[in-house]
Design a protein with these regions (language model features):
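Alpha-helical transmembrane segments used as membrane anchors
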Residues: 1-214
């Protein structure tokens, strides 16, 4: 009898993996994680926005300062999000994707709102869209403002846009890069709306010229 009782208790007690799955599916846990993502995206927005005004003064401190110096109370960092916010902004904007890093904030906020069940969205579409815009604008700004990288504290296309642009120029030349940017932008608009194809057909058919002749 005692053995049967122990077996029943073992069956009724959920295993560790099932407990983890249950916690992950819990609506309250989703809400808390979503709220954290939204708050973190607001924090990054503050850090990014402040970087445009305080980045020049903070750059030397971030580049030359050690972890201990940045962790100090009197670190002299002027970014409104503190030394960690200044580091994140400098890394994501200058070292990564430039000002298109704002699309990271957009996706984090949307993902947070979905987890909180504030808005019903197709998260995978937002992920694809934000990723494409992140990469495209990084390359565009890196290519268009390549000559300003040496004279500015902020790299509009980030190091990603700068390095990819240099490689593309070496392969297809400046006109080729503009063509690649144009065709990829058109493909993105087609991905967003099928009406783009209709508009392009009218454009290539020169329908507006035919109307003027009539």
């Amino acid at each position: 009898m005692a053995k049967k009782k122990l077996d029943k208790e073992a069956e009724s007690t959920p295993s560790s993996p099932s407990k983890i799955v249950a916690v992950c599916k819990n609506e309250t846990v989703h809400f808390v994680i979503g709220l954290m993502l939204v708050i973190f995206s607001v924090y990054l927005l503050l850090a990014f926005s402040s970087f445009f005004f305080t980045g020049a003064a903070d750059q030397s401190i971030i580049d030359s300062g050690s972890s201990a110096d940045l962790a100090a109370v009197n670190n002299q960092v002027k970014n409104y999000a503190g030394s960690r916010g200044a580091q994140l902004a400098s890394y994501l904007i200058n070292d990564c994707f430039g000002i298109s890093s704002f699309f990271i904030l957009v996706f984090l906020a949307v993902a947070g709102l979905k987890l909180m069940r504030v808005r019903v969205v197709r998260l995978w579409k937002w992920f694809i869209g934000c990723t494409l815009l992140l990469v495209w604008f990084s390359i565009f700004f890196g290519f268009a403002f390549m000559d300003h990288y040496q004279d500015s504290f902020i790299y509009l296309g980030g190091m990603h846009g700068y390095n990819v642009s240099r490689w593309l120029i070496s392969q297809v030349g400046v006109p080729g890069v503009w063509m690649i940017l144009l065709i990829t932008a058109i493909c993105f608009f087609i991905y967003i709306s099928a009406r783009t194809v209709i508009w392009l057909r009218k454009l290539f058919a020169l329908s507006f010229l035919k109307r003027e002749k009539k």
